[in-house]
Amino acid sequence: MGRLILEHTLQGHKGRIWGVAWHPKGNVFASCGEDKAIRVWSLSGNTWSTKTILSDGHKRTIREIRWSPCGQYLASASFDATTAIWSKSSGEFECNATLEGHENEVKSVSWSRSGGLLATCSRDKSVWIWEVAGDDEFECAAVLNAHTQDVKRVVWHPTKDILASASYDNTIKMFAESQLDSDWDCTATLSSHTSTVWSIDFDAEGDRLVSCSDDKTLKIWRAYHPGNDAGIATPDKQSVWKCVCTLSGQHSRAIYDVSWCKLTGLIATGCGDDGIRIFKETSDSKRDEPTFEQLTAEETAHEQDVNAVEWNPAVAGQLISCSDDGTIKIWKVAD
């Protein structure tokens, strides 16, 4: 059994902390929350400290933040219905653009692999795709109204311009740009959860997706592409996503976030029961019928709901979490 070792407990925000995001280099992270502020933290020696506080970009709670793949830009999604884009061009972080269009709370934001596209989603049930048109210029490329309820999360595929979204309507949807007319289309709907899908994450290759839900389960989905050797039909030459594994019984409340480590293959969850759990694929797992086991769990990782978990993209086995209890914690998975 592995163990989850607590390395750091950090405080600074007032009220609940909604989101944390590692910088691509792994030596900096950002956090956001109820206090309408973003904090940028960096590591010097063995100490994490706040280097910058960005407090003038939003009028309401900041729900999520994400670094661009190049690490130069930070996007923040807020309950004030806007998404702000920050960069450090002059040595200090500044808000360079504010993206408006959603009717109410923006719940999630995600950069595409190239950094050329940005996706946002909202309680208004829509997903917006923005093109980065140049210096601090963002143009709306698509407004996607495929979901019937609040959209909780958007995540880009790790290698392709395919977007996944998760919703209060219990489904996950995939979107891609049509080869014919450059319109964005919904190419797949993933239905198996019986309640809100809170979060999703792709594996390193992007052929599998993990989802977590209010129904207290984790699900693993696999993409079957046209011409696949499993004999799965692919109508309209679109990839089909099938649920190939369901993990239940480990969580006692809603699972709010999930992160699939691109370095180790481990899956981490943040739960409404205050716990963090780590899952790994078993050694005898099959491609079309994968099996996962719980490697370790920290049942009282936080004193209240765990809102976000994210694996460090550059340091294998390092995990960050944040909570309604107003703390950020950094963990290390040890053998």
Curated annotation (Swiss-Prot):
<dbReference type="GO" id="GO:1902695">
    <property type="term" value="C:metallochaperone complex"/>
</dbReference>
<dbReference type="Pfam" id="PF00400">
    <property type="entry name" value="WD40"/>
</dbReference>
<feature type="repeat" description="WD 3">
    <location>
        <begin position="101"/>
        <end position="140"/>
    </location>
</feature>
<feature type="repeat" description="WD 5">
    <location>
        <begin position="192"/>
        <end position="231"/>
    </location>
</feature>
<dbReference type="InterPro" id="IPR028608">
    <property type="entry name" value="CIAO1/Cia1"/>
</dbReference>
<dbReference type="InterPro" id="IPR036322">
    <property type="entry name" value="WD40_repeat_dom_sf"/>
</dbReference>
<feature type="repeat" description="WD 7">
    <location>
        <begin position="301"/>
        <end position="335"/>
    </location>
</feature>
<dbReference type="InterPro" id="IPR020472">
    <property type="entry name" value="G-protein_beta_WD-40_rep"/>
</dbReference>
<dbReference type="GO" id="GO:0097361">
    <property type="term" value="C:cytosolic [4Fe-4S] assembly targeting complex"/>
</dbReference>
<comment type="similarity">
    <text>Belongs to the WD repeat CIA1 family.</text>
</comment>
<dbReference type="InterPro" id="IPR001680">
    <property type="entry name" value="WD40_rpt"/>
</dbReference>
<protein>
    <recommendedName>
        <fullName>Probable cytosolic iron-sulfur protein assembly protein Ciao1</fullName>
    </recommendedName>
</protein>
<dbReference type="GO" id="GO:0051604">
    <property type="term" value="P:protein maturation"/>
</dbReference>
<dbReference type="GO" id="GO:0016226">
    <property type="term" value="P:iron-sulfur cluster assembly"/>
</dbReference>
<feature type="repeat" description="WD 6">
    <location>
        <begin position="250"/>
        <end position="289"/>
    </location>
</feature>
<comment type="function">
    <text>Essential component of the cytosolic iron-sulfur (Fe/S) protein assembly machinery. Required for the maturation of extramitochondrial Fe/S proteins.</text>
</comment>
<feature type="repeat" description="WD 4">
    <location>
        <begin position="146"/>
        <end position="185"/>
    </location>
</feature>
<keyword id="KW-0677">Repeat</keyword>
<keyword id="KW-0853">WD repeat</keyword>
<dbReference type="InterPro" id="IPR015943">
    <property type="entry name" value="WD40/YVTN_repeat-like_dom_sf"/>
</dbReference>
<feature type="repeat" description="WD 2">
    <location>
        <begin position="57"/>
        <end position="96"/>
    </location>
</feature>
<dbReference type="InterPro" id="IPR019775">
    <property type="entry name" value="WD40_repeat_CS"/>
</dbReference>
<feature type="repeat" description="WD 1">
    <location>
        <begin position="12"/>
        <end position="51"/>
    </location>
</feature>
